[in-house]
């Protein structure tokens, strides 16, 4: 009976975390460049039950009765990096990455991060920045140096070679970083990542006046969320039944005494 209690409790903890992941996905359905997370679960190590009470010719005969699992546990949360659809904004400071890779952005402390969200703006100093205030990094085509993209009061135009020309100013190429293994990326915020050992992206094109939408499967997430709630409630009922039975047993033992 207690094993059933442990199994239901572990399942509820797992379901609670799954619901948290699903809720966060749904909350970011309109977040540009957001990538859907999925909770991966696995079973606890199975225990083998055996019986030593079976005797043959007076000698104990060890007999395996089968396996026993104590439920599931959280293994990892993985991110689906499938590309989202493109949304036309007709805003010249919006950019969408078509293909693999991430815009390289830098915070005020000089730390590099990576994002698929190209909804940029020009700050009071004239630099192209993210909505979070991170500098958008590019390669200056005149000096070949990596630096924050400076726009000033000029107009931006992106050509077919992904080169960003600033009216009356410099030309840049966005620093597009990619990774050999996306599993090493960590979400800093919902659509910004940190990662080690980036490589130069070369399998992409950029669309000006567009944004990449979230890749969350809305219908699938709602369906899974409803199923998770049902499973959670079913485990609650199991625990309530076990609790009621244990109380009854304790009461009967007390009355015998």
Language-model segments: which ranges?
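Amphipathic alpha-helical polymerization modules
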Residues: 1-257
């Amino acid at each position: 009976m207690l094993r059933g209690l442990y199994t239901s409790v572990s399942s509820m903890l797992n379901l609670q975390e799954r619901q948290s992941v699903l809720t966060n996905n749904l909350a970011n359905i309109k977040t540009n460049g957001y990538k859907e997370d999925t909770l991966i679960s696995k079973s606890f190590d199975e225990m083998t039950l055996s019986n030593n009470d079976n005797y043959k010719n007076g000698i104990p005969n060890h007999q395996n009765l089968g396996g026993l699992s104590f439920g599931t546990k959280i293994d990892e949360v993985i991110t689906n990096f499938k590309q989202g659809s493109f949304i036309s904004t007709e805003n010249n400071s919006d950019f969408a990455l078509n293909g693999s890779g991430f815009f390289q952005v830098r915070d005020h402390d000089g730390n590099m991060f990576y994002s698929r969200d190209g909804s940029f703006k020009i700050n009071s100093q004239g630099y192209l920045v993210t909505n979070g205030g991170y500098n958008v990094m590019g390669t200056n085509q005149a000096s070949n140096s990596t630096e924050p993209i400076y726009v000033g009061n000029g107009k931006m135009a992106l050509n077919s070679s992904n080169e960003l020309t600033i009216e009356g100013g410099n030309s840049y190429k966005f620093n597009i970083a990619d990774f050999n293994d996306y599993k090493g990326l960590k979400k800093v915020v919902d659509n910004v990542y940190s990662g080690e050992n980036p490589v130069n992206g070369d399998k992409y094109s950029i669309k000006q006046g567009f944004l990449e939408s979230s890749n969350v499967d809305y219908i699938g997430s709602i369906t899974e969320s409803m199923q998770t709630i049902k499973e959670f409630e079913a485990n609650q009922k199991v625990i309530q039944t076990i609790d009621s039975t244990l109380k009854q047993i304790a009461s009967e033992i007390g009355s015998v005494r």
